[in-house]
Amino acid sequence: MKVAVGTVNPVKVNAVKNVFGKLFDNVEVEGRKVGSGVPDQPFGSETIKGAINRAKNAYRTGDYDYGVGIEAGLTDVEGYVLDIQFCAVFDGLDCTTGCGSGFQYPPTVLAEVLTGREVGDVMSELTGIENLGQKMGAIGYLSRGMLDRTQLTEQSVLMAMIPRLNPKLYRQID
């Protein structure tokens, strides 16, 4: 089985390798640089749209069984702004989606992001950790290492696979 991930971020590619490797035998996972079609710092429904676009664009870069797109963004839920990571899995016909746990950023970080800056840049400045998003991620720093970005990404990938793991409960997805 060949899987294309719509990013070259090693954290996201490794998360897909980890989940698909537990679900299937003989899996090849490759990161592909593709566009998301949404702003670099997505808000609301832009986040899931970005994941879907990345999955479809990754799938189309070669001869793959699946394209996987992962996009993190901010979503307002009843006045609480949460960082939520979405995943989409595309097989050429059907797209399934899921998301991981959501969490809040410190007010100072959110204020900077609302002026147009990207969360990753603000968090790297705040922590002094260069390329934080390609390492433990903001979640790793904020949770004091109890959950890192790979684990958070794995959640969203597994959630997007649920309909594929249970085709009789959903519609038939092969």
From Swiss-Prot:
GO MF terms, alphabetically ordered: ITPase activity; metal ion binding; nucleotide binding; ribonucleoside triphosphate phosphatase activity
Class of this enzyme: hydrolase
Binding site for Mg(2+): D63
Catalysis: reaction(s): XTP + H2O = XDP + phosphate + H(+); ITP + H2O = IDP + phosphate + H(+)
EC number(s) reported in the record: 3.6.1.73
Annotated cofactor note: Binds 1 divalent metal cation per subunit; can use either Mg(2+) or Mn(2+).
Cofactors named for this entry: Mg(2+); Mn(2+)
Coiled coil (UniProt feature): none
A single BP term in Gene Ontology: thiamine metabolic process
Keyword list, A-Z: Hydrolase, Magnesium, Manganese, Metal-binding, Nucleotide metabolism, Nucleotide-binding
UniProt keyword Manganese present: yes
The family this protein is said to belong to: Belongs to the YjjX NTPase family.
Assembly mode: Homodimer.
Function noted in UniProt: Phosphatase that hydrolyzes non-canonical purine nucleotides such as XTP and ITP to their respective diphosphate derivatives. Probably excludes non-canonical purines from DNA/RNA precursor pool, thus preventing their incorporation into DNA/RNA and avoiding chromosomal lesions.
Matching PANTHER family: NON-CANONICAL PURINE NTP PHOSPHATASE_PRRC1 DOMAIN-CONTAINING PROTEIN, PTHR34699
Protein name: Probable inosine/xanthosine triphosphatase
UniProt organism field: Methanocella arvoryzae (strain DSM 22066 / NBRC 105507 / MRE50)
